[in-house]
Amino acid sequence: MAKKPSKKKVKRQVASGRAYIHASYNNTIVTITDPDGNPITWSSGGVIGYKGSRKGTPYAAQLAALDAAKKAMAYGMQSVDVIVRGTGAGREQAIRALQASGLQVKSIVDDTPVPHNGCRPKKKFRKAS
């Protein structure tokens, strides 16, 4: 039986999209989506090759953002709206890395979830105030 000729998968071209930066104390995850919110590519401190507490460093966040931006530019991405969630160490560095990668950053929105006095925080987070 003859083999069917396989069709080449065509990479869809997306000119603009959104970059979600989830910065926790343990890691920073950068997800780049199209304008509808469908993921195109993502990267994190762990994907870069760091393990343990090093994933939460600003340098790991910078490398993760550069990696995600490079992958997104392969899809024709030129500009992004940045949405930041979390209070981790890598949030500022990830934004700077996206700007330095060649992607045009149109806007930056802080969408960190803040409770309206919901669950009681753990002891280490109650001690602060």
Curated annotation (Swiss-Prot):
The transmembrane residues are none
Which residues are in coiled coils? none
Q: Where is the composition biased (Basic residues)?
A: 119-129
A GO cellular component annotation in the UniProt record: ribosome
Oligomeric state and partners? Answer: Part of the 30S ribosomal subunit. Interacts with proteins S7 and S18. Binds to the C-terminus of IF-3; however exactly how IF-3 interacts with the 30S subunit is unclear. May contact the C-terminus of Era.
NCBIfam families the record matches: PRK05309.1 (NF003698), uS11_bact (TIGR03632)
Tell me which HAMAP family the record gives: Ribosomal_uS11
Q: What is this protein called?
A: Small ribosomal subunit protein uS11
Q: Which organism is it from?
A: Thermus thermophilus (strain ATCC 27634 / DSM 579 / HB8)
User: What lineage is on file?
Assistant: Bacteria, Thermotogati, Deinococcota, Deinococci, Thermales
Gene encoding the protein = rpsK
